[in-house]
UniProtKB/Swiss-Prot annotation:
Name of the protein in question: 2-C-methyl-D-erythritol 4-phosphate cytidylyltransferase
A single MF term (Gene Ontology): 2-C-methyl-D-erythritol 4-phosphate cytidylyltransferase activity
Annotated Gene3D superfamilies: Spore Coat Polysaccharide Biosynthesis Protein SpsA, Chain A
InterPro entries: IspD, IspD/TarI, IspD/TarI_cytidylyltransf_bact, Nucleotide-diphossugar_trans
Domain of life: Bacteria
Organism: Moorella thermoacetica (strain ATCC 39073 / JCM 9320)
NCBIfam families attached to this UniProt entry: ispD
GO BP term, pick one: isopentenyl diphosphate biosynthetic process, methylerythritol 4-phosphate pathway
Function: Catalyzes the formation of 4-diphosphocytidyl-2-C-methyl-D-erythritol from CTP and 2-C-methyl-D-erythritol 4-phosphate (MEP).
Catalyses which reaction(s): 2-C-methyl-D-erythritol 4-phosphate + CTP + H(+) = 4-CDP-2-C-methyl-D-erythritol + diphosphate
Keywords from the named record: Isoprene biosynthesis, Nucleotidyltransferase, Transferase
Family in the record: Belongs to the IspD/TarI cytidylyltransferase family. IspD subfamily.
Length: 229
């Protein structure tokens, strides 16, 4: 089986949640948010090692979460950078030399399912890169000056990116090297890989695979967990 390293991004703050604490350690139904996706990664036979990237001050707390999950697959807990892109770059440095594939997942997406992780990994093996994503359903407006609508975009063919995102290791390493050299900035890893011309497969994501960003997301997360019981 090809060796796969999974990087879990857990270095964010909770400013939009109205909190300064790292949101991935906020409790959801009595467990830290990070614990949910970590448990899926630990249980997956397709994941060989896990790298968690978090804020330097949160490394002790992250170790507690890892210990609570009995996560023997966790190879390293790495101090992240100022931005998400910087954090993933640090995580890549800790990936095992044997790794042929790298998956990246947001720790603030606690509802990752084994099925979504598996199908994204398998799709990447066919094309070299794959990401979970959902077709855009809402009408998309482009804003202009003073909050006036500048244009209505055709949503046909538009997808909203999620994680996990899975790549050939050398593709992702190349993309991050180019980004560092040329000053590229992106809000997801696929955008950097795309800039090098590599094909990225869209894998239908899941509506429940939400990213916890706002207080409303926390309410929705609680409802989703209550519905699972």
């Amino acid at each position: 089986m090809p060796f796969l390293s999974m990087i879990i991004a857990a270095a964010g703050r909770g400013r939009r949640l109205g909190r300064e604490v790292n949101k991935v350690f906020l409790p959801l139904a009595g467990k830290p948010m990070l614990a949910y996706s970590l448990a899926v990664a630990v249980a997956s036979p397709l994941v060989d090692e896990i790298i968690i990237v978090t804020r330097p001050d949160d490394i002790p707390l992250c170790r507690q979460v890892v210990a609570g999950e009995g996560a023997g697959k966790v190879k390293a807990i790495v101090a992240g950078g100022a931005e998400r892109q910087d954090s993933i770059a640090e995580g890549l440095k800790a990936v095992a030399r044997a790794a042929e594939w790298v998956a990246v997942h947001d720790g603030a997406r606690p509802f990752l399912t084994p099925a979504l992780l598996e199908k994204t990994i398998l799709a990447a093996r066919n094309t070299g890169a794959a990401i979970a994503a959902l077709p855009v359903k809402e009408t998309i407006k482009q804003g202009g000056e003073a909050g006036i609508v500048a244009a209505t975009l055709d949503r046909k063919g538009l997808w909203s990116a999620q994680t996990p995102q899975v790549f050939r290791r050398e593709w992702l390493v190349d993309a991050y090297r180019e980004a560092a050299e040329k000053g590229w900035q992106a809000t997801d890893d696929a955008a950097l890989v795309e800039r090098l011309g590599y094909p990225v497969k869209l894998v239908p994501g899941e509506e429940t695979n939400i990213k916890i960003t706002t207080p409303g997301d926390l309410v929705l997360a609680g409802a989703l967990l209550a519905g699972e019981k």
